[in-house]
From Swiss-Prot:
Keyword Disulfide bond included in the entry's annotation: no
GO cellular component, one term: host cell cytoplasm
Assembly description: Interacts with host TRAF6 and IRAK2.
InterPro entries for the chain: Poxvirus_Bcl-2-like (IPR022819), Poxvirus_sf (IPR043018)
Keyword Signal (UniProt): no
Transmembrane segments annotated in the record for this chain: none
The protein, known as: Protein A52
Any one biological process term the GO annotation gives: symbiont-mediated suppression of host innate immune response
Recorded family membership: Belongs to the orthopoxvirus A52R protein family.
Length: 190
């Protein structure tokens, strides 16, 4: 079976003609005027840099997802390595994760709701939110995600995104992004 295809373009239309065994069919289709672009979302797991176009919330979403599902036993780049350092800030501000695990009963059915309520109380107790508070909160969320992963509560990492939205506004996310960019440049230069 032979099939012949001819395509001709005229103005804003193109014609597709197919011939198969003495049968001819023509189709007239309008040209698509709008260009479509596929948006490719970067995978931040092995990222070593942080660009101005990168969205901090998207980066945190991936960070919590990877940490909640796979942990830190996988290879990750300098960006995630810098975010991992926020864990230390969290322990300084909120205490050890073991204490919080017991106090909030993180492994229980209500553990996720208890955590969100705790975040709301923390936000209310702060008179003026600082970047340090926000960095500590990111570290706390990451530590909580580790607790849930170890208990095989894999889908709970999404509660940390909710906590971040409750606690950190876009302005503070931009400040955190600048701090991370500076740290990454400093690490690269040393």
């Amino acid at each position: 079976m032979d099939i012949k295809i001819d395509i001709s373009i005229s103005g804003d239309k193109f014609t597709v003609t197919t011939r198969r065994e003495n049968e001819e069919r023509k189709k007239y289709l309008p040209l698509q005027k709008e260009k479509t672009t596929d948006v490719i979302k970067p995978d931040y797991l092995e990222y070593d840099d942080l660009l101005d176009r990168d969205e901090m919330f998207t980066i945190l979403e991936e960070y919590f997802m990877y940490r909640g599902l796979l942990g830190l036993r996988i290879k990750y780049g300098r960006l995630f390595n810098e975010i991992k350092k926020f864990d230390n800030d969290a322990e300084e501000q909120f205490g050890t994760i073991e204490e919080l695990k017991q106090k909030l009963r993180l492994n229980s059915e209500e553990g996720a709701d208890n955590f969100i309520d705790y975040i709301k109380v923390q936000k209310q107790d702060i008179v003026k939110l600082t970047v340090y508070d926000c960095i500590s909160m990111i570290g706390l969320c990451a530590c909580v995600v580790d607790v849930w992963r170890n208990e095989k509560l894999f889908s709970r990492w999404k509660y940390c995104l909710r906590a971040i939205k409750l606690f950190i506004n876009d302005h503070m996310l931009d400040k955190i992004k600048s701090i991370l960019q500076n740290r990454l440049v400093y690490v690269e230069m040393s």
